[in-house]
Structures are given as C-alpha cells and as structure tokens.
C-alpha cells in the first residue's frame, strides 16, 4: 500500500492529533469523575462508621465486612493516620492498639514454652475466652493479624509467618533454615515427627534428622516425647493447652 503524501497526509495527521486530544480530554474527565465519586463514597463510609461505631467494634462479622469495604476504596488504617479517616471516626485505631497490647502480653507469657512462635488461631481463641462475659466472640483471626501489622512501625519485634498454610506470630528474633522450616511444616500437618518419618518422607540421613531436631528443641519449638517405641518430637505451640496459656497470661 502506497503511503499518502502532500496535503492529504497532513490532513490525516491533523485528524489523528485531534482524535488524540479529544481522547485525552475524555480520559481526564472520566478520571476526575471517578475520583469525585470515590471521594464521595469515602465520606459516606466515614459517616456510616460514626453512626455504627459500636456495632463495628463489637460484631466481628460486621467489622470484617466493613474493613474489607474500606480497604477496597483506599481507606487503609495502617497508612492513613489522619483524624478524618474512617478508622478515627469509629475509634478502630485505638481498638487495634488495645488488641496488639494483649497479643504482646500473650506472646511474651508463652515464649519459654513455644520458643516465641505462637499460632494466630491460638491467640485469637485465648483472647476470645477472656471476653466470654460479653456474650459474643468479638475477635477474629483477621483482627489479630491487623493488630500485629499495626506494630510494624515499632520495628521487627513481632512478625507474621506462614507455616504449612497456617499463620504464626514470631515474637523472638529467629532465623530458620530450610530444613527447620520443612520439619515445622510436617509437625503442623501431623502434630509430631520422628526420625523415621523424616527419613521415609525426605530421604534424609539420620545425622541430618538429628541435627535439625536438636536445633529446634534447643529453640523450644519442639518438645520431646520419649515414652513411645521411637522418640517423638511434638510442636510446642500445639502442646500448650488453653488452661496453661491462661495461667501463664495471668501470672505474666
């Protein structure tokens, strides 16, 4: 196909330029409209938060839905520190701060027993038992996770880690190597491991199994059960029952 030259080509270039300008104007206009609508929606959500503050704080399902909606429209509680934020309107900054303080206390109280690695589900269950007097379970695991996330500006003291698909709170500086992570994932699935289990499933040498198990025991992440035919290594966090956690917490 021959390329057009002369006046006709110039006209085509002018048309293309005009189309581009019109397109940019439309995009800018639509962007402004969307931004305006989003701002209106955010203000409406803040008003809703103020009107339903009590229910948001006390009803975990209602709060979880509200949080998801707020995050979708850009009201992130861990980014926005403004007094005009939806979280400030409903008092959720203070709420998550209070939850974080309680999470810290539970983690510190159980460090000697679990090596500073405690599952989010255990922390959530324990805190909810403390609130039975209110007649409802007002904390969800997502609340505990958000509370731990809110501690990030304070430094790396509390970190969320995922082991075998389950979330844990690490409250002690701890670097785990690949073998140690593999063993902890197996413990999360089975409840315990033995040298035979590790050798059969991962084809490890006996010396390798002993080394990694001893390392985890020294970190208080595994407890030894020598009553069976073969020595078993149980996950420390799985062995701490609720009564033990309550005792530790009350006497911390």
Curated annotation (Swiss-Prot):
> How would you describe this protein's topology in the membrane?
Peripheral membrane protein
Q: Has keyword Amino-acid biosynthesis?
A: no
* Designated name of the protein: Vacuolar-sorting protein dot2
What lineage is on file? Eukaryota, Fungi, Dikarya, Ascomycota, Taphrinomycotina
Principal location listed in the UniProt entry: cytoplasm
What is the similarity comment for this entry? Belongs to the SNF8 family.
Q: Which residues cross the membrane?
A: none
Q: Which GO annotations describe the biological process of this protein?
A: karyogamy involved in conjugation with cellular fusion; late endosome to vacuole transport; protein transport to vacuole involved in ubiquitin-dependent protein catabolic process via the multivesicular body sorting pathway
Q: State its role.
A: Component of the endosomal sorting complex required for transport II (ESCRT-II), which is required for multivesicular body (MVB) formation and sorting of endosomal cargo proteins into MVBs. The MVB pathway mediates delivery of transmembrane proteins into the lumen of the lysosome for degradation. The ESCRT-II complex is probably involved in the recruitment of the ESCRT-III complex. Negatively regulates meiotic spindle pole body maturation via indirect regulation of the pcp1 gene. Required for efficient entry into pre-meiotic S phase.
Q: Which Pfam families match?
A: EAP30
Supply the source organism for this entry: Schizosaccharomyces pombe (strain 972 / ATCC 24843) (Fission yeast)
Q: Name one GO cellular component term.
A: cytosol
InterPro entries noted in UniProt: ESCRT-2_cplx_Snf8 (IPR016689), Snf8/Vps36 (IPR040608), WH-like_DNA-bd_sf (IPR036388), WH_DNA-bd_sf (IPR036390)
Record's subunit section: Component of the endosomal sorting complex required for transport II (ESCRT-II).
Q: Which Gene3D superfamilies match?
A: 6.10.140.180, Winged helix-like DNA-binding domain superfamily/Winged helix DNA-binding domain
Lipid metabolism as UniProt keyword: no
Q: Which compartments is it annotated to reside in?
A: Cytoplasm; Nucleus; Endosome membrane
Coiled-coil regions, chain positions = none
Q: Which UniProt keywords apply?
A: Cytoplasm, Endosome, Membrane, Nucleus, Protein transport, Transport
């Amino acid at each position: 196909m021959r390329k057009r030259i002369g006046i006709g080509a110039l006209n085509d270039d002018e048309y293309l330029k005009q189309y581009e300008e019109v397109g940019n104007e439309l995009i800018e206009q639509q962007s402004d409209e969307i931004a305006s609508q989003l701002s209106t929606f955010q203000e409406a959500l803040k008003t809703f938060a103020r009107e339903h503050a009590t229910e948001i704080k006390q009803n975990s399902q209602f709060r979880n839905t509200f949080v998801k909606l707020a995050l979708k429209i850009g009201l992130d509680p861990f980014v926005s520190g403004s007094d005009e934020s939806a979280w400030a309107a409903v008092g959720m900054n203070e709420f998550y701060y209070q939850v974080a303080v309680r999470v810290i206390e539970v983690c510190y109280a159980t460090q000697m027993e679990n090596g500073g690695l405690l599952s989010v589900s255990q922390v959530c269950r324990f805190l909810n038992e403390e609130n039975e007097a209110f007649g409802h379970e007002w904390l969800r695991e997502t609340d505990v996770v958000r509370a731990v996330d809110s501690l990030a500006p304070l430094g790396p003291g509390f970190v969320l880690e995922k082991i075998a698909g389950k979330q844990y709170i690490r409250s002690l500086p701890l670097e785990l190597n690949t073998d140690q992570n593999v063993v902890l994932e197996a413990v999360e699935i089975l409840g315990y491991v033995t040298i035979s289990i590790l050798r059969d499933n991962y084809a490890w040498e006996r010396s390798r199994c002993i080394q990694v198990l001893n390392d985890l025991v020294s970190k208080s992440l595994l407890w030894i059960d020598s009553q069976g035919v073969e020595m078993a290594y149980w996950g420390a966090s799985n062995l701490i029952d609720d009564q033990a956690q309550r005792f530790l917490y009350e006497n911390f």
